[in-house]
């Protein structure tokens, strides 16, 4: 059961907090055999230089090893529990296969404890089941889609997201993404039936800057508030508008300027996003 709760304004930090609580989530620790240490990088690369701004600090986290390939075919798995994962917006499910192996998978909406899921070439079109796109009926809502066969799911993994299978053309399936983009994917690529869980994720309001810091996100300082040495918009006597069209700290135009690189996979886009 999902509970959306608005906090009472007992302090400025609590005034705007909106929390989403799922009473069906596991409250204990994760399964120890599928957890790895996650080292904090704080946005630095191997030379110690900042390569991603606004990262650092935050609560210590452990990485849950999630099975994106779903390659354990024709072995039924029972859902032991649904868990919170601090590394992603979606919830994850711990499943126990008939041969005794446990794995984490992305939990689709509607998947509950003691339900069964299975992967394979020809399995039932049911929530949580994984199969190649060639065996999925047109119009089906899917997620966790591979871009290359056997590589593992790369698309549609965030909370509440889904795509729709709208056509099949020779060796390709045509899928419609949430952005409105129509894209061709090889029919041998796999996908999971259903919508990704935790669709209420966007209703959450952190309420204060400190809650961002708990998540390892540092402040974003405006360029006009900096010195000229730090940003093209910096400096000036008194408050200024920056004196030029908006640019990034490296002088590249921003706010509407397209920076997407041309890639080989562009030829697979049938219709661009809206």
Curated annotation (Swiss-Prot):
This is Large ribosomal subunit protein uL2. Residues 257-274 have a biased composition (Basic residues). The keyword DNA-binding does not apply. It comes from the Bacteria. GO terms for molecular function: rRNA binding; structural constituent of ribosome; transferase activity. Part of the 50S ribosomal subunit. Forms a bridge to the 30S subunit in the 70S ribosome. Keywords: Ribonucleoprotein, Ribosomal protein, RNA-binding, rRNA-binding. SUPFAM superfamilies: Nucleic acid-binding proteins, Translation proteins SH3-like domain. Belongs to the universal ribosomal protein uL2 family.
